[in-house]
Design a protein with these regions (language model features):
Chain A
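Conserved acidic/glycine
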Residues: 1-75, 259, 268, 273-362
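A residue-level signal for beta-strand positions that form part of recognition/binding surfaces
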Residues: 14, 85, 248
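Structural signal for conserved beta-strand scaffold positions within catalytic alpha/beta enzyme cores
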Residues: 19, 90, 222-224
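Short, histidine-centered active-site or binding-site loop motifs used for metal coordination
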Residues: 21, 92-94, 189-192
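Cofactor-binding active-site loop characterized by glycine-rich and histidine/acidic residues
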Residues: 49-52, 56-183, 199-205, 210, ...
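Short, well-ordered beta-to-alpha junction loops that form the rim of enzyme active sites
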Residues: 92-93, 253-255, 326-328
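Glycine-rich ThDP/TPP pyrophosphate-binding loop and its adjacent helix/strand module
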Residues: 135-323
Length: 362, 326
């Protein structure tokens, strides 16, 4: 038998629309309306300020370990493409997207402050709660997609995960299921170059993460993850395709974790300052701001006013959160929502704790 | 009432629930065209089509996580693990997400799925095809672990499991799949999850078991009665977790003597929990130490040695006699 070649074409596109100086590639302009451009800018700025504030709160001991998102704010470009009926399936570095989709800042503070309430997503918001085991949530977005298709709903599930997640089995199982069943799922990989201390180069031998789509015969694309216009344009293409029955897409957002993995680690131990400085030049907010100023959509006064405005919004959210936690929590409600109906053996344990607590009070 | 075996009874539960409720979907490896390696899902694909009876890629974690996503959207997936020995891939999804999403979201989301898996020895199978690891699931807060012991209760419990708003692990004793037939009514029948049953009344000793071990237990109870005039009260747990201890602790207060039987390894097995609850709730009524007749703390051997591993009537009878003579 001869050796025969099966020709597979693998061409991974890299899309960047705004360069580091904020200059637009006109041919690629996604023509986003001005008011949406400003909303995106404001959402990125809000996420940055909130992130900075949480770092302060963590250092002051007011919240526990938290995972900063600094540098990854352009992800809102992807969330902005979704309709309210679509589903956002986040991991733990999607605060900007979650806020865009209606989650409150208090809710984020609840989670990092150690309150279960952070996961209590209000009715009407189709965000799943944060999923911490890396990569495991990818499968949920595929099941959601299958169910949407089964019900004849023209909705889409967008799942976020990091570069480290592409090493997990669940990611590959999810990609495979999504491709086999052609589910309306958009895989949004935030390649921020570091999985705690392990660099992207040690995570996978592949040149790009987007090329992993080839193995599952689905479209894969790399986007400049620090360019909100590219993120928006690439996500829109994938979401439109999924919505019209064209199946799943893998998107690799090439971005950078400018801060630590969580407040429990020190990146100086494993990466150089120089590398961080290089990426700071590509800051997604600075670049976008330059572009908007260039288009006269933002002025010095406008930037200042908006910054003041988002800082106030963060402060007000923090105040609301403090007021709510000030009321204290009832430890006995830890037993709630374990099951739809509490089994007798669990009820007995709750009563046991109740007695202990009331004895302590006396 | 037609007499059917457990495979047919489970098939009946699935097909009737699918008929009633279009949110019920069946998925797993070979469950469609092939009808499942044990033929449990035989014919379903012809009746309900490939969108509802889904042959999935071979990936247990994938099947479980995919089912979770479907359930979050309001479907009621019934997924099959081809053998419980391969379900450990799925354990992460069940432990980390299926069991917690209701809790994590404060009741906003729920995962009304069923994970079915044939478990246990007695069918002369290869390695990984005969084990009994229900304790893994039973130890996980947020899951329910149900194990039927007859065609009729398998059908009724599976209907309840499908309708349950929380994730249910449904372990099917494969040794009983075709072991005997029973009258199973065609009309709807359910059994409450979380409730055990007294299947034989007696005053001298209490035998507590579930699943595949119910057969040797009932055999031993008949022999005790016929040959020795000893009347054993037999309790079938039906749900391992959350455990219903009301019936068995009550029975222990009456008889004062208890033997617990299961195939699972002894240490940290469901029997350990049963004994703990007996000590907590019936200690002063016990006339003898509680005995456990179980699998040993080893991997279940390949089938030339499994008869000696599995708790059979002889071992049960010996334990009962020692308990009575104490």
């Amino acid at each position: 038998m001869p050796r025969k070649a099966i020709n597979l074409t693998c061409k991974v596109e890299y899309l960047s629309i705004l360069d580091e100086t904020g200059k637009l590639d006109k041919k690629l302009d996604p023509s986003i309306p001005d008011d949406l451009l400003l909303r995106l800018y404001r959402a990125m700025l809000l996420a940055r300020r909130f992130d900075e504030r949480m770092l302060v709160l963590q250092r002051q001991g007011k919240i526990g370990t938290f995972a900063p998102i600094k540098g990854q704010e352009a992800q809102v470009g992807a969330a902005a493409v979704l309709e309210p009926g679509d589903w956002l399936v986040p991991s733990f570095r999607e605060m900007p997207s979650e806020l865009w989709r209606g989650k409150s800042m208090e809710s984020v503070l609840f989670t990092y402050g150690g309150y279960n309430e952070g996961g209590y997503i209000p009715e009407g918001i189709n965000n799943l709660p944060v999923s911490i085991p890396v990569g495991s949530q990818t499968l949920h977005a595929v099941g959601l997609g299958y169910a949407m298709k089964y019900r004849g709903d023209k909705s889409v599930a967008m799942v976020f995960f990091g570069d480290g997640a592409t090493s997990e089995g669940d990611f590959h199982e999810a990609m495979n299921f999504a491709a086999v069943f052609r589910t309306p799922t958009v895989f949004m990989c935030q390649n921020n170059h570091w999985a705690i201390s392990v660099p992207r180069s040690r995570q996978s031998h592949s040149k790009t993460l987007a090329q992993k789509a080839l193995a599952y015969d689905m479209p894969g694309i790399q986007l400049d993850g620090n360019d909100v216009l590219a993120v928006y344009a690439g996500a829109k293409e994938a979401v439109d395709r999924a919505r019209s029955g064209g199946g799943p897409t893998l998107i690799e957002l090439v971005t950078y974790r400018m801060s630590m993995h969580t407040t429990a680690d020190d990146p100086k131990k494993y990466r150089s300052e120089k590398e961080v400085e290089e990426w700071e030049k590509r800051d997604p907010i600075v670049r976008f701001e330059k572009y908007l100023r260039g288009r006269n959509l933002l002025t010095d006064a406008g930037v200042e006013e908006m910054d003041e405005d988002v800082r106030n919004e963060v402060r007000e959210a923090e105040e609301r959160w403090l007021e709510q936690i000030g009321k204290g929590v009832d430890p006995l409600d830890m037993f709630d929502h374990a099951y739809a109906e509490m089994p007798p053996s669990l009820r007995a344990q709750k009563e046991e704790l109740e007695r202990e607590l009331s004895e302590k009070k006396r | 009432m037609p007499k059917i075996n457990m495979v047919q009874a489970i098939n009946l539960a699935l097909s009737q629930e699918m008929e009633k409720d279009d949110s019920v979907v069946v998925l797993g490896e070979d469950v469609g065209v092939d009808g499942g390696v044990f033929r449990v899902t035989d014919g379903l694909i012809d009746r309900f089509g490939p969108e509802r009876v889904i042959d999935t890629p071979l990936a247990e974690s994938g099947i479980a996580g995919f089912s979770i996503g479907m359930a979050l959207y309001g479907l009621k997936p019934v997924c099959e693990m081809q053998f419980s020995g391969f379900s450990y891939f799925a354990m992460h999804q069940m432990e980390s997400h299926a069991a917690r999403l209701r809790w994590r979201s404060g009741g906003r989301f729920s995962v009304p799925m069923v994970l079915r898996a044939p478990y246990g020895g007695g069918v002369r199978a290869l390695e990984h095809h005969s084990e009994s690891r229900e304790a893994y699931w039973a130890h996980t807060p947020g899951l329910k672990t149900v194990i039927p012991s007859s065609p009729r209760n398998a059908r009724a419990l599976l209907v309840s499991a499908i309708r349950d708003p929380d994730p249910v692990i449904f372990y099917e004793p494969k040794a009983l799949y075709r072991a005997f037939r029973e009258d199973v009514p065609d009309e709807e029948e359910t059994l409450p999850i979380g409730k055990s049953q007294i299947v034989r009344e007696g005053k001298d000793v209490t035998l507590i078991s579930y699943g595949a071990s119910m057969r040797p237990v009932l055999e031993a109870a008949s022999e005790l009665s016929a040959r020795h005039g000893i009347e054993a009260e037999v309790i079938d747990l039906l749900t391992v977790s959350p455990m219903d201890d009301e019936l068995f602790t009550g029975s222990a207060r009456k008889t004062g003597r208890v033997v617990v039987v299961h195939e699972a390894p002894r240490s940290f097995g469901p029997g350990a929990e049963i004994v703990a609850r007996l000590v907590e709730k019936s200690f002063l009524f016990l006339e003898a130490p509680v005995r456990r007749v179980t699998g040993f703390d080893i991997v279940i051997p390949l089938y030339q040695r499994e008869t000696e591993y599995l708790p059979g009537p002889e071992r049960i009878l010996k334990a009962v006699r020692e308990t009575l003579d104490f």
